[in-house]
Amino acid sequence: MNTPSQAQVRRAIAEAQTIVVKVGSSSLTEPSGHLDPQRLNALVAAIARVRLMGGRVVLVSSGAIAAGFGTLGFDKRPTDVADQQACAAVGQGLLMAQYEAAFARYGLRVGQILITVSDTIAPQQYRNVRRTLDRLLDLGAVPIINENDSLASNEIRFGDNDRLSALIANIVVADALVLLTDVDALYTAPPSEPGSKRISYVPNVEDALAKVQVGGTGSNVGTGGMVTKMEAARVAAVSGIPAVLTCASNAGPAMMGDPVGTAFAPINDRGSSRRLWIGFASHPQGTLVADSGAAKAVRGGAASLLAAGVVEVKGDFAAGDAVWVDDEQGNHLAKGLVGFDSEEIPQMLGRNTAQLKRFLGEEYAHPLVHRDNLVLV
Ligand SMILES: Nc1ncnc2c1ncn2[C@@H]1O[C@H](COP(=O)(O)OP(=O)(O)O)[C@@H](O)[C@H]1O
Ligand SMILES: N[C@@H](CCC(=O)OP(=O)(O)O)C(=O)O
């Protein structure tokens, strides 16, 4: 695809039918661990304007922990996971109450969806998330999403909402992703560093990643810093979705396509949201080792992984889990959702479809990983 000009990217954002807006903790809360209703209301006003003009907006909002820790008597964001989970349980309610009241002033309803990684990699939950989001949007509501911090385990969690927002943009087939934070744009280095320069347009985020010096959070409530925002912009770009990054007070102009913040061009045509989800969100639970013929077929991009071409299975997983597909040298070729439990697979290895049917029955005469569930890495 040809690289679009900045004006084209800004126009695409202005014309977006479906927009995912992600807002960070520092844009909604006080450092003392309480909500800042004024800033939250200003954000809601900008989103409501787009919504009332007919746009479909999904809001991915951080801020549960940051809104809850002051209320629970902590003087700074706790580091203990159980404390954070308790703060999130309190703060999430406060956050939603505030959003509910703020959107109601414009006659708009909100719907809360809390997501954990483990919920969303299973095909059925993925479909449920997608269906609920689509229905909320069809009904004119504004879905508000956060990670389910009170339930997420420390080992498997998004941890930041930046990447989650890019995955949500895929799920709802968004036309634009708007990342709102406490800095007005991406800079060539963390803005605290002397000489860092504002970047208004990134035609290729993968090239930019090599050139820009990105750092962690600048506030005491944010988590991901610019690293995860760049990753979100990259996921959006490779998914064919233009993105803009700016401060929350620029939300309105950013969604109108005004030249604020940093615009990121898409670098691919749109992909299948399901495949992107597998590629970005899933955590492989095991490995299928492909022989050289199967490795070549998988690398070609259009083939399913058949039992006949698999020489080894590693790990303990259930049908529907994500697995790595490796070559015999141990290189990762692809990630996929496997169709069988790990203990069923050894008896299937090396057998073609006719043999699987004859020896094991009809239900085994299927690929280990169907090509629709396979994503090259
Ligand atoms: N190259 C960079 N350009 C802009 N900001 C950067 C850069 N590197 C690091 N940062 C920091 O990232 C911070 C935003 O991330 P974070 O604090 O996690 O915000 P949020 O709570 O909105 O997710 C900025 O305040 C800034 O200090
Ligand atoms: N899910 C957490 C926030 C995680 C997060 O991404 O925070 P931030 O870096 O402020 O966007 C919460 O609501 O407190």
Swiss-Prot record:
Pfam families: AA_kinase, PUA. Gene3D superfamilies: Acetylglutamate kinase-like, PUA domain. Pathway: Amino-acid biosynthesis; L-proline biosynthesis; L-glutamate 5-semialdehyde from L-glutamate: step 1/2. Residues 285-359 form the PUA domain. GO terms for biological process: L-proline biosynthetic process. Substrate binds at S62, D149, N161. Keywords: Amino-acid biosynthesis, ATP-binding, Cytoplasm, Kinase, Nucleotide-binding, Proline biosynthesis, Transferase. GO terms for molecular function: ATP binding; glutamate 5-kinase activity; RNA binding. This is Glutamate 5-kinase. The lineage of its organism: Bacteria, Bacillati, Actinomycetota, Actinomycetes, Bifidobacteriales.
